[in-house]
């Protein structure tokens, strides 16, 4: 069973390399959209945007997460909560996929919060005072990013639109782009939102490598 898991993880690594090469050699773009809720003139749709950039990013995520998973299968093998760790790790990866593929700000917020929640649980994995304090710092910094994403959603609401690919600096308020950049700075640990990154080292070593 362990060998099958390792093979599947290696397959993800090769799949990631394949997606990177595919994204680098294609210019095609596909938008899949379905209406989830509709009331009179207001509707909410679920969209998936697949273009060269999202394919490359998916490839990068799969390559890194697959490599980390192969390492984890050896490094975390004797941990009591080994299965729980892997479930949290792949919930983290799925949340990243949400942010890559879905151009709707509401659904991006779900992926964003998924990253925040799984980051908190992974940093607090060892359940001691240091890891819990580090997890709380990580969570609070992510809440700043959540607030900024919610602010961008409210700005987009004034435009009667939540879809990122319809954003145009010539038409839409430039403050939306600025707020989204600031939100991204909290997640990527840019100054002045970088305090959580060294604190996240309290997580298991493979998590630190994945986050960095």
Regions found by a protein language model. Name each.
Residues 1-212:
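Core, highly hydrophobic multi-pass alpha-helical transmembrane subunits of bioenergetic inner membranes
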């Amino acid at each position: 069973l362990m060998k099958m898991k390792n093979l599947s993880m290696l397959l993800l690594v090769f799949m990631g390399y394949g997606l990177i090469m595919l994204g680098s050699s294609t210019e095609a773009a596909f938008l899949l959209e379905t209406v989830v809720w509709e009331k009179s003139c207001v509707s909410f749709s679920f969209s998936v945007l697949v273009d060269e950039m999202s394919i490359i990013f998916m490839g990068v995520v799969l390559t890194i997460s697959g490599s980390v998973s192969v390492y984890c299968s050896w490094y975390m093998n004797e941990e009591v909560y080994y299965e729980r760790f892997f479930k949290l790790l792949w919930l983290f990866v799925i949340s990243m996929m949400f942010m890559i593929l879905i151009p709707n700000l509401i659904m991006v917020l779900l992926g964003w919060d998924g990253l925040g929640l799984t980051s908190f649980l992974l940093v607090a994995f060892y359940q001691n005072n240091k890891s819990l304090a580090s997890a709380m710092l990580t969570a609070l910094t992510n809440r700043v990013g959540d607030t900024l994403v919610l602010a961008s959603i409210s700005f987009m609401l004034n435009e009667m639109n939540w879809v990122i690919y319809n954003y145009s600096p010539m038409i839409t308020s430039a403050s939306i782009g600025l707020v989204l950049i600031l939100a991204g700075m909290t997640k990527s640990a840019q100054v002045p939102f970088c305090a959580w990154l060294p604190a996240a080292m309290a997580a298991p070593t493979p998590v630190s490598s994945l986050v960095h």
